[in-house]
């Protein structure tokens, strides 16, 4: 397990990068990204759903609450990224897939 300082640095960096990707995709996407107090939220225009991204320091994971599911991403030192152990998806890839599923739009791309 990575130490707390490294976790905070890497999770802040990963969530900031994701936030910037979400901002770039907002115009065509039907959603809006918003960050408050270290928590990143994705709000959908229809108001029916919300994705919540939070760093969980005690367990050194980034958690995503989306599509009635909790996703717990762990730090992968080799990949230098937070990955979902079950699928191997990194934070950006998983978020892109979840957005596509929520909006039923396979064209959504996070860059």
Question: Where are the regions that the model predicts?
Answer:
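N-terminal intrinsically disordered, cationic/polar leader segments
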Residues: 1-111
């Amino acid at each position: 397990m990575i130490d707390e300082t490294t976790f905070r640095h890497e999770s802040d960096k990963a969530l900031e990068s994701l936030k910037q990707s979400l901002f770039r995709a907002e115009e065509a996407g039907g959603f809006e990204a918003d960050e408050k107090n270290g928590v990143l939220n994705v709000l959908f225009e229809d108001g029916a759903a919300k994705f919540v991204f939070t760093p969980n320091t005690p367990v050194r994971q980034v958690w995503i609450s989306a599509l009635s599911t909790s996703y717990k991403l762990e730090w992968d030192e080799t990949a230098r990224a937070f990955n979902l152990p079950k699928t191997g998806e990194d934070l950006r890839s998983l978020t892109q897939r979840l957005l596509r599923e929520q909006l039923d739009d396979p064209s959504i791309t996070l860059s």
